[in-house]
Amino acid sequence: MEARAAGYFLVLIDRKEIRMGFGIFGVSADIGIDLGTASILVYIKGKGVVLKEPSVVAFDRNTNEIKAIGEEARLMIGRTPGNIVAVRPLRQGVISDYTITEKMIRYFIQKAVGKRTFRKPRICVCVPSQITEVERKAVEDATYNAGAREVSLIEEPVAAAIGAGIDIAKPCGNMVVDIGGGTTDVAVISLGGTVVSESLKLAGDDFDEAIVRYMRKKHNLLIGERTAEEIKIKIGTCYKRADELTIDVRGRNLVTGLPRIITLTSDETLEALREPANQIVESVHNVLEKTPPELSADISDRGIVLTGGGALLHGLEQLIEEKTGISTMTAEDPMTCVAVGTGRYIEFLNNPTAEE
């Protein structure tokens, strides 16, 4: 499972006949999307996760023709001819390339619901907390242009809390740390809303970049982001492991220019990942300092919950607990928390009188 991979596209389709809206215009679906920097995840009610692909698009820079989207495009990163470029149209949780993002959203909506004609769906999109109004408008416009009938937005930490099984409607403080691919959102939630939050433009992708820098500096070895991600998943840690792990790393020797293989240890990844991990801990500390006393007491009792693909980095749970003195736990399935939370939220929007 991808250790970032943090941020995701989550598509939730309500299969209830009453919502399907069969008619002369085809099938209508209610869809929830987590606009993630690193991956796309598709969740269908009653079926669970049915699609998981990277949020990568490959296109011809001469003609602007899209060549591949998702996993196929990811495999092209670093291996394309000069005229073909594989890019991530989302950076740090927001749209960096509007046109490509719009086409990518449209592609995954169609892939999720099938090729058949369907009425324009209502779509709920997850966005990082504290993004600007301009960035929010860009998300809304791209989603409308991708085929939405109505668009609503929900902050990622709120969706993550719902998906983690936290009852956010109660007057009780809950802290969620959602670590995606491009952003880390730290939030205290009570009575269905965010009380205090901080959005850090550092997450799973930055773990990969830290490993790339370390390999270049310490071993004079140039590696790609896919290799760095593999290192992170297999032996990466931000807390001392009981048993040291190793991995053979292939790259290009910066001195000779020739291919080279070295053996990397988990202790070395601890050194490589120390700075980005400490920045996340510092963000948690900042939010705790701004939290009202009564809610701080709740968090002390209930603990901190980690969600998102970045929460899978070994040792992060222990590091936060050691630095804050507060019990810290990772959600049961951190990578799908936002998917489930988005689905429950859009169900609530369509049926606000439901008990849930």
Roles of regions detected by a PLM:
Residues 2-179, 187-305, 311-356:
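Nucleotide/phosphate-binding catalytic cleft detector across ATP-hydrolyzing
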